[in-house]
Amino acid sequence: MARLEDLPLRDDLKGQQPYGAPQLEVPVSLNVNENTHRVPLEVAEDIIERLAKSLMSINRYPDREFMSLREALAAYLGAGLTSENIWAANGSNEVLQHIFQAFGGPGRKFLSFTPTYSMYPIIASGTQTEYVSVSRGDRFELTPEFIRKAILQHKPNIVILCSPNNPTGTPLGLDCIEAAYQAITEASGGILVVDEAYQEFGADPSVTAVSLLPGRERLLVS
């Protein structure tokens, strides 16, 4: 059997390691965004019933536009959003992949503040987007001024802010997001992504970048 290094792999991908996360049998697994409570029986029964109905049409492709899901997500998020403001995919990583495919690529730059989610540079590498890493410092905190300075200096096409940050848990104020949006608009006219994968686990789940979406067409929240 041929090994990967024997195949015509892109030079920039040779020697790279795939993303991975420990899969441990432990009561609380914070690194994978899991709920520690089991699914209630009545919820499980409802899911099973709906799956059974769906199986009757499994010979056909599902709705490619995910309209029912997008409408439900818009209702859940509020902030005046409609299904037209929502995109759905197979997890947040696929959404981020789509963003890099559309707005990154050769000759373009992506900036994030490290340490942060280790999947970001992997997606950047896969799309041949230059990765710019800016250190958060000793307490892992960010300020509007610090964010603005980094963006204006490097002029990235994509900026991702993770809130609360993975793996440090550091929250991010809305003032930081507003500063980042203003800076990237001035610097490159690029895209600002706020990754809120752990937003519901934050100290105040009501504080979300979703509230900043109206009027900011280059702001995306995943």
Model segments located where?
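N-terminal small-domain helix-loop-helix segment of the aminotransferase-like
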Residues: 2-91, 98
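Short glycine-rich anion-binding loops that position phosphate/pyrophosphate groups of nucleotides
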Residues: 33-36, 92-93, 117, 163-168, ...
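Short acidic capping loops at alpha-helix termini that bridge into adjacent secondary structure
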Residues: 81-86, 107-109, 196, 217-218
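Active-site pre-lysine segment of PLP-dependent enzymes
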Residues: 142-154, 167-222
